[in-house]
Amino acid sequence: MKQAIWGGVALALLAVTTARAETRMFSYDPISPDAKRLTGAGVTILFNQGLLGSGRPVKVLATGVPAEARLRDGRQKDLGPGGLAAMDGVDADAMLFEVDAKAAQGKVYVRAFCPGSTRLWLSFSTIAIRRDLRIQAFGDDPNAEAPNGEKKARLCGTLDFSYRGEWRLPGGGPPDPNEDWTDTLNGPR
């Protein structure tokens, strides 16, 4: 009986957390050499923030040009044996996502961030207001194999950014970063 009650409470909390998720968008300026080289003017991250505070990234947007990478959950095992924990110089506790190469400009991001790779994973430090961000890029490496013959991903770059600010999003749904929202300032289209 107690298990059923606790299960119900957990389910209710999950429903409340999901219902309260808020879509937000933060912009960041590049500070590391890799970030400056790969992003130019920086990045803007569209993410969902739950009640527990940390954000789950949905899209990475180039701040200076209309290019976006849609993200999906990344799997540690796709990086090779041990995942992030087995790589040197990597934050093993970071959130891992894979760039969807078939959506938007995903292929462009794969080629730019990890030349020669066909897949791109991005790990994110905690996304929070007024907090700097670290993104590490990983690509599949056709020439690298683990001792047991499995494929192994490689670290392509460590991108450090300083927090710039938050975009005010229009109400009623997620924003379209490629849409000129200033068109609506002079009345309906």
Regions found by a protein language model. Give the residues of each.
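Contiguous, well-ordered beta-strand patches that form the walls/edges
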Residues: 36, 57-124
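Short, solvent-exposed loop/hinge segments that bridge or flank secondary-structure elements
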Residues: 24-25, 30-63, 111-125, 180, ...
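Bacterial N-terminal signal peptides
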Residues: 7-15
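Bacterial N-terminal signal peptides that target proteins for export
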Residues: 1-7
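Beta-strand-rich cores of mature extracytoplasmic or soluble domains
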Residues: 92-188
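Structured catalytic/translocation cores of nucleotide/phosphate-coupled proteins
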Residues: 45, 53-56, 74-78, 123-136, ...
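Sec/Tat signal peptide C-region and signal peptidase I cleavage site
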Residues: 17-21
